[in-house]
Design a protein with these regions (language model features):
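S-adenosylmethionine
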Residues: 1-150
């Protein structure tokens, strides 16, 4: 961490908060991915990740979520570039899973950017359902359209 930032935090937040922030940077961050089950079953995605020498673990309670580690650069993985999964925070996946969306449902996501929850909903509702994704920012909505429509 650049010294000037540490000094700024120290002067604005005090030593205790600054130390907590710095300790947070040292903690190992977990990476969670949401499997794109429209492209492949979870077990196949796990097998492919293992072939890419990525360590994979199931996430209890969310059947399409995996924790991955032991990779250098996620965009360097063919499985990622092929769209077999998307990085998504576990809290977002939990929220999506707990809604219980099922085939044929209609979903409105009013705080949609960057789109992970909407994609999760789209996979859950399938081709018989509909997902309407909105965001307060036209810029963010445009990014989602560009990312997900090509």
């Amino acid at each position: 961490m650049p010294l000037w930032i540490v000094k700024m935090w120290h002067s604005q937040l005090g030593i205790d908060k600054t130390e907590k922030i710095l300790a947070g940077f040292k903690q190992e961050k977990k990476t969670y991915v949401r499997c794109n089950t429209a492209k492949a079953p979870v077990e196949e995605i796990k097998r492919i990740l293992s072939q890419e020498n990525v360590s994979v673990a199931d996430v209890e309670g969310i059947p399409y979520a995996l924790e991955i580690k032991d990779y250098d650069y996620i965009a360097g993985l063919k499985s990622f570039r092929d769209g077999l999964y998307q990085i998504q925070d576990i809290s977002s996946m939990t929220a999506g899973y707990m809604t219980g969306f099922k085939a044929g449902d209609t979903v409105i996501d009013v705080c949609a950017a960057p789109g992970g929850k909407s994609v999760n909903a789209a996979i859950s509702v399938g081709t018989d359902g509909k997902v309407y994704s909105r965001d307060v920012s036209d810029y963010k909505a445009g990014l989602m359209k560009k990312i997900y429509q090509g």
